[in-house]
Amino acid sequence: MSSEEGKLFVGGLNFNTDEQALEDHFSSFGPISEVVVVKDRETQRSRGFGFITFTNPEHASVAMRAMNGESLDGRQIRVDHAGKSARGTRGGGFGAHGRGRSYSRGGGDQGYGSGRYYDSRPGGYGYGYGRSRDYNGRNQGGYDRYSGGNYRDNYDN
């Protein structure tokens, strides 16, 4: 039995919730071997999610069912098995629609436990918030804005 089986993803954390507070709220469900609150690499500020690993996977399942949707430090938290992907369990990610980012970045097959906890881009906040441009300076959106804004094809005329 691997430690991944007893590993839970905890999302929606208050930015002030630390490892000790997280452990305090989950320790009543059984022995915990590891608690991690994921932090931004540059600012060391919490990214609002973390992981808890129980020594017994059954304890993790009980904790997940009991704590999912509960309030922790004034925020409603989401608890799920760390190995599951966001797409497979929530139909597309946890509220990431329209912002260009989800917890399981890089595709639907990579779960929360994939090891991609940090945003490696400078600043860490620019991902997905603007239109990307190609090397000619044109938008990669649905139409070329320099063509007069006509985004309809010839079949619509």
UniProtKB/Swiss-Prot annotation:
Its main location: nucleus. Residues 105-114 have a biased composition (Gly residues). Induction: Up-regulated by hypoxia. Arg-105 is dimethylated, probably to asymmetric dimethylarginine. Phosphorylated. The modification Phosphotyrosine is found at Y155. It is found in: Nucleus; Cytoplasm; Cell projection, Dendrite. SMART domains: RRM (SM00360). The modification Dimethylated arginine is found at R105. Keywords: Cell projection, Cytoplasm, Methylation, Nucleus, Phosphoprotein, RNA-binding, Stress response. GO terms for molecular function: ribosomal large subunit binding; RNA binding. The modification Omega-N-methylarginine is found at R47, R105, R121, R131. It holds the Pfam family RRM_1. The modification Phosphoserine is found at S147. GO terms for cellular component: cytoplasm; dendrite; nucleoplasm; nucleus; spliceosomal complex. SUPFAM superfamilies: RNA-binding domain, RBD (SSF54928). Residues 6-84 form the RRM domain. Interacts with RPL4. Associates with the 60S ribosomal subunits in an RNA-independent manner. Associates with ribosomes. This is RNA-binding protein 3. It comes from Homo sapiens.
